Amino acid sequence: MNKEEWLKKGYVTESVDKTLDLKAEIDRLRKEKNAIILGHYYQSGEIQDIADFVGDSLALAQWAAKTDADIIVMCGVHFMGETAKVLCPNKKVLVPDFNAGCSLADSCPADAFAKFVKEHPDHTVISYVNTTAAVKAVTDVVVTSTNAKQIVESFPKEQKIIFGPDRNLGIYINSVTNREMLLWNGACHVHEQFSVAKIVELKKQYPDADVLVHPECKGAVAKLADKVASTAGLLKHAVNSPKKDFIVATESGILHEMRKQCPEKNFIPVPPEDSTCSCNECNYMRLNTLEKLYNTLKYEWPEVTVDAEIAKEAVKPIQRMLEISEKLGL
């Protein structure tokens, strides 16, 4: 066991015996340790299939808040692990790879955001869940793409609002609520890649297809959509729609669950503008593998920690989001 190397790499580097039945071993370890595995829709199919629960950011936070497991393994990105730890300070929260960050969270450094908030003292601060715990600590209420519109609408029209860090989501929420929120200039590197040209091209090939777009995409892309929604909302639309073809502009991991729930339907991922990369896949999300998940459960590392003072402040806007969401039936 080379802990020094693990710390340097950000994950357990021990090689896994290739003859092991990894799924069976992961199952054994989670039962022995009373652990729950939570997986985001943007994880690889094999991670989603072994998770106890798969969902979007809101659902994962809700599940973490109510679990009676002793250990939460968050198969997603680092801020999701932080959110779980803030909600469950007495539980052990693990992530398979500390390097699984988030370009959107990185676009909003806590010090810079706190300064921005201080410069606008008469504003309510609404932060997207894709932020660090330190950013949440200077926030009044957290939102996800599932509940952002409804939570923004719960404030009086005259209330000034700072919304961060995703400018595209902020622009979309401004348009559907007729607001002029002050927006932080951040973005998701995956959703920024989707272009009007690629969707128009696919629409020619599949003229009857519904276009499904995540609100983190640019406004011009969202205008082409038959449905703009969170990953959970897009999945629900696909399940309930009579259509057979769907052009999907979000991280391609969601296609796994769409195809599982609707095997008779055709889901076409929108390719990124840059054809030299697989940029409709989040490279951070894909850092998590079955091997890393197995080692994480085996050694109970990497473990997520959050500074106690930050956690004390960050839990308030997260709890507020969960309470509002429950009242709204989300």
Where does each model-flagged region fall?
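Active-site loop-to-helix "anion-binding N-cap" substructures in soluble metabolic enzymes
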Residues: 1-248, 255, 260-270, 274-330
